[in-house]
A protein has these predicted regions:
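Bacterial N-terminal signal peptides
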Residues: 7-16
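Positively charged n-region of N-terminal signal peptides that target proteins for export
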Residues: 1-4
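Compositionally biased regions
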Residues: 6-7, 156
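Functional surface patches built around histidine and acidic residues
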Residues: 21-502
Length: 502
């Protein structure tokens, strides 16, 4: 008999390795037993290219095999795998977990039959024999980062720097933390591939630290670490048992949206309303993932979320997407919420509408699986509901940003406004953000220094993206804003031109 756990993003108990001094980033000592070595050889024969052996994954697999031998109801459930990985000091975000039960002499053949021929860079096998039956767990992981040593246990109030290097082809690492109370913190990142990010652990409890990186398929989780502060448990809080998966797709999607809104409610946020046009975009991407057999934000047959929304004529200011895969739609959503960066998307304060799409499929092993896409959007803001004009709101946003930066306020300049307005009209006509000699025309007003920022935005407040607002050399500013639909950038866009001079 074989069972497969396939949670992915796009994630008798053995004692943890010694708490004091236990660090991620160092492979612990764990030599495979004779039975484990035979099973591992079957893995290396089945998976090509043959994965390397990870002692940390071996230890985690042994804990899970012991759970299976003891009669645990769901021995390789996602939460159990996550806790076993933490106890074994493995930072793999979502390894595939396969459970095989067979007579000891039949283990290699049973393992070979059970594996779905995935790709993997590292593997670990754990085996426990009980009453003539071998319980074998195989963990297969695609590693995306190499971490420097980082503590698994810290004191409340401790600080530590997470550092490491992304593996090719990944870049632009960014680190997120979910605090014990559910707050998500964006701790910063780097252009990559090397990174070093200082982290703080202000209180006791279970912290989840995540490294997200940009890959060929968009952002992916590169590493996931559980850090216990003040002696906290490495196990995640128990979740309420999910209801059986509804047979029809729409009901499953509605259940995920309800779960998403329940999480928002626990954090004091208003619910997002169902948006059928967004759900249609989400469902098509879930189907594309199922057809490709992989979890990713970008696929050859399905571009990034922004392009998909624009192609469907859906106006939005900002869009946030989660993708995941698991045995059921709610399990996939729970896997997404276990990721700090994905949870941050669920908790976006400006999001007001959302669409959920799923696609059911079967893994190579024959096990059923569900591909999930969640898209939350912030509405566009053309300024129509404000007593201020879009131009005035852009100036107001620039004033606020200058004050936040501790810089002198900018003076509005009517001559510069006229130049910026003409530039914005020109951009809308050509459907292309370009400066078109605007800085030279500003210098023609007998100014010594000029710079220009132009962009297409979903609202006046997006003007804080203006790169030159932080330059203390500038004292005057001109703003031009024109609203309209764009074939390239979507509906209800604002073309914004900002020109700065001394």
């Amino acid at each position: 008999m074989a069972r497969l756990s396939s949670a992915a993003l796009v994630l008798a108990v053995l004692p943890a390795l010694a708490g004091a001094g236990a660090e991620y980033g160092r492979e612990p000592a764990a030599a495979p037993t004779r039975l484990e070595a035979r099973a591992l050889e079957a893995v290396r024969t089945r998976v090509r290219p043959a994965p390397g052996t990870s002692p940390a994954l071996v230890l985690a697999a042994r804990e899970l095999a012991a759970r299976a031998a003891s009669g645990a109801r769901e021995p390789i459930a996602r939460a159990a795998v996550r806790a076993a990985l933490a106890r074994a000091l493995a930072s793999d975000p979502s390894p595939a977990a396969v459970l095989v039960e067979a007579a000891p002499d039949e283990v290699p053949a049973a393992v070979a039959r059970a594996l779905p021929r995935p790709s993997a860079t590292h593997a670990g096998v754990g085996a426990v024999e009980r009453d003539g039956t071998a319980f074998v767990v195989v963990l297969l992981s695609e590693r995306r980062a190499r971490l420097d040593p980082f503590p698994r246990e810290v004191a409340p109030g401790a600080q530590a720097a997470l550092s490491g290097t992304l593996l090719a082809p990944f870049s632009r690492p960014r680190v997120f933390i979910t605090r014990p109370g559910g707050e998500v913190v964006d701790a910063g990142g780097a252009a990559g591939p090397a990174f070093r990010v200082p982290l703080e652990f202000p209180g006791a409890g279970r912290h989840v630290v995540e490294v997200v990186a940009e890959g060929e398929g968009g952002p992916e989780v590169a590493a996931l670490l559980t850090v216990a502060a003040g002696g906290a448990s490495l196990d995640a809080p128990a979740r309420t048992a999910a209801a059986p998966e509804p047979a029809d797709r729409s009901s499953s999607e509605a259940g995920v949206l309800a779960a998403l809104n329940a999480t928002r409610a626990r954090h004091g946020l208003a619910p997002v309303t169902a948006a059928p046009e967004v759900a249609a975009v989400a469902r098509r991407h879930a189907e594309a993932m199922a057809a490709a057999g992989r979890v990713a934000h970008v696929l050859p047959a399905s571009p990034d979320a922004g392009a998909r929304l624009r192609g469907a004529g859906v106006p939005y200011r900002r869009a946030y997407e989660n993708v995941a895969r698991a045995g059921t739609a709610l399990e996939a959503h729970a896997a997404a919420e276990d990721s700090p960066a994905h949870l941050a998307n669920v908790l976006r304060t400006g999001a007001t509408r959302a669409g959920v799409g799923i696609a059911r499929a079967r893994l190579a092993s024959g096990d059923p699986t569900v591909y999930l896409t969640e898209i939350l959007i912030e509405p566009t803001d053309d300024g129509a509901a404000s007593p201020l004009t879009p131009d005035a709101r852009v100036r107001e946003a620039l004033w606020r940003e200058r004050a936040r930066l501790g810089l002198a306020p900018l003076t509005a300049d009517a001559a510069l406004d006229a130049l910026a307005r003409d530039a914005a009209e020109h951009m809308r006509t050509r459907d292309e953000p370009e400066t078109d000699g605007l800085a030279d025309r500003a210098l023609g007003l007998r100014r010594r220094l000029a710079a220009v920022d132009v962009f297409v935005a979903g609202g006046p407040d997006d003007a804080v993206r203006s790169a030159n607002v932080k330059d203390a050399r500038f004292a005057r500013v001109g703003v031009g804003v024109v609203a309209g639909d764009s074939a390239r950038f979507g509906k209800a866009r604002l073309w914004i031109a900002v020109v700065y001079t001394d």
